């Protein structure tokens, strides 16, 4: 997928701005707080229907203005597609070729984003790593999103009953009905997670070897609160889940929360046998996340027949020279990339790069 033209009106610190990007590397250079990330945000919003920085439309509107709009002209699957997003406080309107659209403009992400905040996947809590499973790998299975939604709904209802059981000092009898549903959707969800990880890990490992020039080996394993093996089938997971719920029932009522299940699981990421969260340098952690982003790009290419757009916010220039060049050589001529930096401090000749200067809400 290619972005041919971007127009912003009253978006963040931009009054009125049009940008015609290049086909490959687009470098947005400028001092901090000039609007570089705002450009990436506008592209992400047009591709996905949401911002990666805020859920409040008001924050996307230029100060003292009543609305903002973004218009993007994309080339996708051999045709031109116009996406227009209009924002007023508390409301968002998305049009695709003049037709109102709810949710995702394209039906698939169309964009892969890497910001410094993504390092929390390595350094942060298990919830951050589950997000990778649920929202990055999950879309590659047709039933994953439905299963995740049903599990979360049942989990929320069950936790409410646990709170009620403690307050009323009951044994939580009605929980049995919800236990069955929790085990049904939870066992399916856990099975899908493990299956997707097993399916995709060889490609992830090979990519990581390539980006580190064979110097490092990555391992990713699934850590289940049910303590199951990776070869367990769905029925076996269900039985283990059901048994664990019975064992911890009293403790769950006391703590008013469900203590076992895929919502408590984690990924264990190691490099050369060492826990990446504890022992890897920030550069190594950044390379792990970059590996996962490149994997997503190539997997979406396999699924849809075209590459998504890549957005890199102040991360490319934090890589060492060898890893940066390995990445650019891999993506060059294939993926339309937008990257931000405070200054261009490496040789971009030969990478078909188009350089823009961003200053005070203007692009030149």
Swiss-Prot record:
Main location: cytoplasm
One Pfam entry name: AAA_23
InterPro entries, per database record: DNA-binding_RecF, DNA-binding_RecF_CS, P-loop_NTPase, Rad50/SbcC_AAA, RecF_2
SUPFAM superfamilies xrefs: P-loop containing nucleoside triphosphate hydrolases
Localisation: Cytoplasm
Binding of ATP, residues: 30-37
Any one biological process term the GO annotation gives: DNA replication
Source taxon at top rank: Bacteria
GO molecular function, one term: ATP hydrolysis activity
Alphabetical keyword list: ATP-binding, Cytoplasm, DNA damage, DNA repair, DNA replication, DNA-binding, Nucleotide-binding, SOS response
One GO term describing the cellular component: cytoplasm
Full protein name: DNA replication and repair protein RecF
Organism annotation: Pelotomaculum thermopropionicum (strain DSM 13744 / JCM 10971 / SI)
Gene that this sequence comes from: recF
């Amino acid at each position: 997928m290619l972005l041919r033209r971007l127009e912003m009106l009253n978006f963040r610190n931009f009054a009125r701005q049009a940008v015609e990007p290049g086909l490959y590397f687009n470098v947005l250079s400028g001092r901090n707080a000039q609007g570089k990330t705002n450009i990436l945000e506008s592209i992400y919003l047009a591709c996905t229907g949401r911002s990666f920085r805020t859920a409040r439309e008001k924050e996307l509107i230029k100060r003292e203005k009543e609305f903002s709009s973004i218009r993007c002209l994309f080339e996708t699957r051999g045709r031109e597609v116009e996406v227009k997003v209009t924002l007023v406080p508390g409301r968002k309107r998305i049009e695709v070729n003049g037709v109102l659209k709810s949710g995702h403009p394209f039906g698939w992400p169309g964009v892969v984003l890497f910001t410094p905040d993504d390092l929390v996947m390595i350094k942060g809590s298990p919830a951050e790593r589950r997000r990778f499973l649920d929202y990055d790998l999950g879309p590659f299975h047709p039933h994953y999103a439905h299963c995740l939604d049903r599990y979360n709904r049942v989990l929320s209802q069950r936790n409410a009953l646990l709170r009620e059981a403690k307050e009323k000092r009951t044994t939580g009898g009605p929980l049995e009905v919800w236990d069955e549903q929790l085990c049904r959707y939870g066992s399916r969800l856990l099975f899908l997670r493990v299956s997707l990880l097993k399916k995709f890990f060889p490609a992830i490992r090979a990519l990581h070897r390539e980006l580190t020039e064979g110097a490092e080996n990555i391992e990713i394993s699934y850590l289940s609160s049910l303590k199951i093996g990776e070869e367990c089938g769905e029925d076996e997971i269900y039985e283990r889940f059901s048994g664990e719920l019975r064992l911890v029932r009293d403790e769950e009522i006391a703590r008013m929360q469900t203590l076992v299940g895929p919502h408590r699981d984690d990924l264990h990421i190691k490099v050369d046998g060492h826990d990446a969260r504890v022992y890897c340098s920030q550069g190594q952690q950044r390379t792990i996340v970059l590996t996962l982003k490149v994997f997503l790009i190539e997997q979406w290419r396999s699924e849809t027949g075209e590459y998504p757009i890549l957005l890199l916010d102040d991360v490319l220039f934090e890589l060492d020279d060898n890893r940066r060049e390995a990445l650019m050589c891999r993506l060059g001529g294939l993926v339309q990339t937008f990257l931000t930096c405070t200054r261009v401090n490496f040789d971009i000749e030969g990478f078909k790069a188009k350089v823009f200067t961003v200053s005070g809400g203007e692009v030149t």
